[in-house]
Design a protein with these regions (language model features):
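N-terminal mitochondrial targeting presequences
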Residues: 21, 25-29
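Residue-level detector of alpha-helical hydrophobic segments embedded in or interacting with membranes
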Residues: 12-14, 20, 58, 444
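N-terminal chloroplast transit peptides
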Residues: 1-16
Length: 565
């Protein structure tokens, strides 16, 4: 529950959560029941028990023709009226091997776009899916060989002799999707978007008009810039487009980013885009000195773009010499506080950014941000607590970035629990008011939070033991009342991120759409929940014709009106 702090106390009162106690993962007392797919005792539902083989099965490579033909499937229950005629899009890594070689990291997987179109009568859905046919994907598929270096360590065979001084990375187009202004874009935050046909999912090419850099088809290194002109053109440098744009009414708000190594700073440029892809207001630029890691996500309030800067260091030599991928040479700075940047929006009447330090934590996703009646900015994030001694030893100043995600599937025995944080900043005084893992959700392992105007947070829920495990259900946390509502998917099931879709005109609340994989049947389904009654379970379920790998992000394009995510 939000605690309002008086203005006089705001400068002096700082609430921070205590360091997470050392938690030992519980023994999987329910594993025999998981094997049998039988009922699990209530006390064991949220203990995080799972079979590693089940979890690894969610990262089996998907054959290219698995969903190539549109297939109409029956819906159990009824699709709500406001969703009928609309389309759920979901982007994800889906191919994890090439030429008999398994990729080093699931996030290096080739991007796959899923399309689920709901029928007008609410009883059927039509499913199709297709790989994003980037130029590297087509080339590697044709030769059945890994030909490009990847962000998280997958590299062509041949070692340094082949890979040294090759700094161009494969755009895997595997992270998110946006449907806006008649364009469907597959996003990957270290490159340019790829535009797809909204119905057939055929790849049309790179959307290089959205981020400055070399023209489509030319090999380039994005996320780096020197002069923004002739030098960049000669070296093939350019901007990257975020994988996390946000919708604000009739505008799509997004940013591009690029490191400027000679200045040692990260440069962001925010755009607010109309439905015809023109700028609603002039772009806003912002520099972050001494920043090694580009923001993965951002928030938006009436007056500010909100960015949480994670503190990290990078050792470029192993990457340049062809020994490691760029993510492998990143180290999280566990002793340094994060930085919250409040960047004035164009037309806000404000000019000076506000930058406030936050106690050490690592922000993963921004659920939402808003301004209260006193002008303070609230930011809800999912994050790792860097003071957790289980995963961040106190005697180490740095730890590897996403190292435990390598292998056939993310290894939750070595991944920190994702917790919900609420951070409050007073831009008038430039101070941090509070930063906490709110008590009602303390101990809940939550990820992919979404917040709406009613003050409710919906998120994937893994367990209530403060440990790390795959998502096995969903939670709704009411910021105003502190109440928490939960829903458990059942044994051997794994839940993807929720996609939030507003209810129809004249209705309050939201519908929640999610993919859930059942290891017992090796099947994936699309589930629709009422955001006001998530504990009641799905109101509609559409089985997919083929199981799909565990996905990342998606969006919903209604029959009429702008998309939601």
């Amino acid at each position: 529950m939000i605690k309002v702090i008086g203005a006089a106390a705001a400068v002096h009162s700082l609430r921070c959560p205590p360091p997470v106690a050392r938690l030992t993962p519980l023994k999987a007392t329910t594993l025999d029941k998981l094997d049998a797919s039988t009922a699990v005792d209530d006390d064991d539902v949220w203990n995080g028990a799972y079979r590693e083989a089940d979890w690894e099965a969610t990262y089996n490579s998907l054959p290219a023709d698995a969903l190539a033909e549109p297939t109409t499937v029956p819906v159990e229950g009824t699709v709500p009226a406001s969703l009928r005629g609309g389309v759920l899009y979901r982007c994800s890594p889906a191919n994890f091997d090439r030429g008999g070689t398994r990729y080093k990291h699931v996030l290096d997987g080739d991007g796959f776009m899923l399309r689920v179109a709901f029928g007008q009568d609410g009883t059927k859905a039509t499913v199709t899916g297709r790989y994003v046919e980037t130029a590297p994907y087509v080339e590697e598929t044709t030769k059945d060989e890994i030909l490009y270096r990847n962000t998280f360590g997958t590299q062509p065979t041949g070692g340094p002799l082949r890979n040294a001084f090759t700094v161009t990375l494969k755009n895997v187009a595997n992270t998110n999707v946006v449907s806006w202004g008649g364009r469907l874009l597959a996003l990957w935050e270290a490159g340019a978007p790829h535009e797809l046909d909204a119905v057939t999912l055929e790849t049309r090419g790179e959307a290089t008009d959205l981020c400055r850099g070399p023209p489509a088809g030319r090999k380039c290194t994005r996320g780096v810039t020197i002069d923004g002109g002739l030098i960049d053109e000669a070296l093939g440098f350019g901007e990257s487009f975020t994988a996390h744009p946000h919708v604000d009414g009739d505008r799509l708000v997004a940013f591009t980013w690029a490191q400027q190594p000679q200045r040692g700073e990260m440069n962001l440029k925010f755009r607010e885009i109309n439905g015809d892809w023109t700028d609603a207001v002039p772009p806003v630029s912002h520099a972050m000195p001494d920043c090694a890691l580009a923001p993965h996500d951002c928030g938006l309030t009436e007056h500010y773009h909100v960015v949480v800067e994670n503190r990290a260091s990078i050792q470029m030599a192993p990457f340049v010499l062809g020994l490691k991928g760029p993510a492998q040479v990143l180290e999280i700075a566990t002793k340094e506080g994060a930085r919250c940047h409040l960047i004035p929006r164009a037309g806000s009447g404000l000019t000076a950014p506000v930058v406030v330090e936050i106690p050490p934590f690592f922000c993963i996703h921004v659920g939402d941000a808003w301004e209260d009646g006193d002008g303070r900015v609230h930011v809800v994030t999912s994050a790792w607590d860097l003071r957790d001694p289980t995963h961040f030893p106190p005697d180490l100043d740095t730890v590897p970035f996403l190292g435990a995600w390598s292998g056939p599937a993310p290894d939750f025995k070595r991944i920190p629990p994702s917790l919900l944080f609420e951070t409050v900043v007073d831009p008038a005084t430039g101070t941090l008011v509070s930063h906490e893992n709110p008590r009602p959700v303390r101990g809940l392992c939550l990820e992919h939070p979404h917040v709406d105007g009613s003050g409710k947070v919906w998120a994937s829920l893994a367990n209530d033991r403060g440990i790390s495990s795959p998502p096995s259900g969903y939670a709704c946390y009411d910021l105003k009342t502190g109440s928490v509502e939960r829903w458990y998917a059942g044994p051997r099931k794994f839940c993807e991120e929720l996609v939030v879709a507003p209810k129809g005109e004249g209705e309050e609340g939201v519908w929640l759409l999610a993919l859930i994989y059942d290891a017992a049947t090796d099947a994936t389904s699309v589930n629709v929940f009422d955001g006001d009654r998530i504990s009641a379970g799905p109101v509609a379920v559409a089985p997919l014709p083929h199981a799909v790998p565990h996905g990342l992000h998606g969006c919903f394009q209604p029959r009429d009106g702008p998309m939601s995510a």
